[in-house]
Amino acid sequence: MCIRDRQRVDQKLPHHVEYFHFVDDPYSHLTAQILETFSARYNIELSCYLVSKPPGDNAPEFELLMNLARYDAYMIADKYGLSFEDHKEAPKQDVIDIAQSILAAQDDQSFISCVAEVSHAMWSGDKEELLELSNKFGSASSKEVSEVVARGDARRAELKHYSGAMLYYAGEWYW
């Protein structure tokens, strides 16, 4: 048992996992599909953060990275019982913005409950469905979205990482 886990047990604290979701990242879409099951299966406290694209030199050819990530997600999704259609293009900015505003308005539990549905509608390019989900779950203003993403980016940077679709637990990163 690692030192951090020993401290957690001694203090009778739950396992705490932090999840970093980059809305238009294909891997975040795959992760979104397992979050609810993951949090239900294990006795964990799950904190969810919205983040922006990798900062600085962490993704020097960002468009190429996203093209390859879409292809990779398409190729592996079915093998894990997940879904990801063959997307040659990134989602349109208007559907990204709606999805992000919905997710930014959620607390952790609501985020876990709705992220897969919101992500599916966004990757399907279904603006009408996203607007219905916005009415159902609520949405944040663009200023609130910026603040939520800034908090997520700050936490991710504090933990010394740069990517989305990442889980952080007991001092270690998992993808």
Give the positions of each predicted feature.
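A short, charged/proline- and glycine-enriched loop
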Residues: 10-17
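Structural alpha/beta surface segment adjacent to cysteine/selenocysteine redox centers
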Residues: 23, 29-122
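Conserved small/polar residues in nucleotide/adenosyl-binding loops
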Residues: 1-3
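Low-complexity, charge- and small-residue-enriched intrinsically disordered regions
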Residues: 6-8
